[in-house]
Amino acid sequence: MRRFLALLLVLTLWLGFTPLASADVAGLVPCKDSPAFQKRAAAAVNTTADPASGQKRFERYSQALCGEDGLPHLVVDGRLSRAGDFLIPSVLFLYIAGWIGWVGRAYLIAVRNSGEANEKEIIIDVPLAIKCMLTGFAWPLAALKELASGELTAKDNEITVSPR
């Protein structure tokens, strides 16, 4: 029985492990080497008043990776060699979205303490909003400071619990 279980274990491990598969970039090739892309580039249409705008656009796309159809694809697997394609714009988007949210939160906290909070939520106090907006660029540091001090989160006794 021990030999049978040992043989079963060896077979399970041997058949269970698969060789490492490398998809690299899923069959994508540099656009400058793709015949379908070259065909599309030859028929480039100008999109602006610049007579060479179509050609310039395809020169920029030639640095990307193309599929069989000759269209550029985004590689979003975290490789730093392709950081300009997705990583940098996505981090910039998150920073700007956080800035907008932080400034909105700061504005609501500032008007909450005034006597006419409901009115200032509808009719925006522009000087106060600009003041909040100019301090919003450092929102990640301010958020960490408030998180460390406990000001960012609500205390347990301030959270209502459903009677269910």
Curated annotation (Swiss-Prot):
Stretches assigned to coiled coil: none
Keywords, alphabetical: Photosynthesis, Photosystem I, Signal
GO cellular component terms, A-Z: photosystem I reaction center
Annotated signal sequence range: 1-23
Keyword tRNA processing included in the entry's annotation: no
Cross-referenced Pfam families: PSI_PsaF
Biological process annotations from GO: photosynthesis
Free-text function comment from the UniProt entry: Probably participates in efficiency of electron transfer from plastocyanin to P700 (or cytochrome c553 in algae and cyanobacteria). This plastocyanin-docking protein contributes to the specific association of plastocyanin to PSI.
Similarity comment text for this entry: Belongs to the PsaF family.
Protein name according to UniProt: Photosystem I reaction center subunit III
